[in-house]
Amino acid sequence: MGLKQVQLFVRGRVQGVFFRASTQREAKRLGLTGWVKNRSDGSVEVLAEGEEDELKELIAWANRGPSAARVERVDVRWRGFSGDFFDFRITD
């Protein structure tokens, strides 16, 4: 399917529930690179790159999140692969 990039905006009760750490763990399990961060509006933003099938798995996971999270909505934006990332990090 090819390499792609996806940007996610995850809304709901997603801060203070280990969402970023859980996202990092899931992304690494899937072999993805990129980052995850909290946003000032209470949402979490994810930018991930890798194979399209694995990115779709990450999107499905983000719609559930870790057990303490209550995901209300995930906005998805597909983008072109950049190759700018070498690991998956939690950032500011």
UniProtKB/Swiss-Prot annotation:
PROSITE patterns: ACYLPHOSPHATASE_1, ACYLPHOSPHATASE_2, ACYLPHOSPHATASE_3. The active site is at 20, 38. It catalyses: an acyl phosphate + H2O = a carboxylate + phosphate + H(+). The keyword Hydrolase applies. Residues 5-92 form the Acylphosphatase-like domain. InterPro entries: Acylphosphatase (IPR020456), Acylphosphatase-like_dom (IPR001792), Acylphosphatase-like_dom_sf (IPR036046), Acylphosphatase_CS (IPR017968). Its EC number is 3.6.1.7. This is Acylphosphatase. The gene is acyP.
